Regions:
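Multi-pass alpha-helical transmembrane bundles in non-GPCR membrane proteins
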Residues: 2-269
């Protein structure tokens, strides 16, 4: 007859063994779930970031040498704009000048400085977020430059021949263009932006007979040469993917501004 002391309950080793394994499996599943959740969160963030820039044009991939050249060319333009502003203000302040000369000089000079300074900063800045902002500012300032260039010719040369209305039309278009750039955030096609610039630039054809009769022939020649240089420059703007073509575009734009500024300084103000 077995001893009562030997009637010990069986050890639960066999039943307890699966418990650590089950816990390990649960922990492994939890880690996998956390990893999947992390990947999903990162994917969601990436998708949200991508949706913010959906439809926006990517930043041009200029080389360092190109960006240095782009910054230098329009940095020179900003310096020339300051010089032009000073010369025009001094000339407009002389006795016997047209009443609108001083206002026209200030508007045109500031427009030159703003455009070339914005372009210089856009090409000089490296961080992409800031670069996108300055690209919008740069493109918006082109509208300001076009309207600012019109202002002396409209208020002084064509002042009594519908020039005020033309000046108002230009600045209204400039404001519309700036709002367009700000809200579209460059989702619009590149050709549409260029088309608006060219349409504003050549709007003067509606007052061309009056301008030809009132403006000095040399001033008219300088004005037309500047317009042609701007227009030819857009060809190189479209070819910006070719190395240093954007720099060539800058040179044409700068030359166009120089010719038209000379027309204003020498013959209008």
């Amino acid at each position: 007859m077995p001893d009562a002391s030997d009637s010990t309950p069986p050890r639960p080793d066999a039943a307890a063994a699966p418990v650590p394994i089950a816990r390990a499996d649960a922990a492994s599943r939890s880690q996998r779930l956390l990893r999947m959740t992390g990947h999903g969160a990162r994917a969601a963030v990436s998708t949200a970031a991508a949706s913010k820039t959906a439809g926006c044009r990517s930043l041009p991939r200029y080389t360092l040498g190109e960006e240095i050249a782009n910054s230098i060319t329009h940095g020179i333009g900003a310096a020339l704009g300051v010089a032009a502003l000073v010369v025009m203000i001094v000339k407009a302040a002389t006795a016997g000048s047209h009443p609108a000369s001083l206002a026209s000089a200030i508007v045109f000079g500031i427009a030159l400085i703003l455009e070339y300074l914005a372009s210089t900063l856009y090409h000089a800045i490296a961080p992409k977020a800031a670069k996108r902002v300055f690209r919008i500012i740069d493109h918006s300032c082109i509208y300001v430059l076009i309207a600012g260039t019109y202002t002396p010719f409209c208020l002084i040369t064509l002042g009594d021949h519908g020039g005020v209305a033309l000046c108002i039309a230009q600045w209204v278009l400039a404001v519309v263009g700036i709002l367009f750039e700000a809200f579209m955030r460059e989702r619009q096609p590149r050709w549409l932006t260029v088309a608006i610039y060219l349409a504003m630039g050549w709007l003067v054809v509606f007052k061309l007979p009056q301008l030809v009769s009132l403006l000095d022939p040399m001033a008219l020649a300088l004005l037309v040469i500047g317009g042609v240089l701007y227009t030819v420059g857009t060809v190189f703007y479209v070819l910006k993917k070719v190395r240093y073509m954007h720099t060539v575009f800058h040179v044409f734009v700068l030359a166009g501004s120089v010719f038209q500024a000379l027309a204003v300084i020498l013959y209008v103000i």
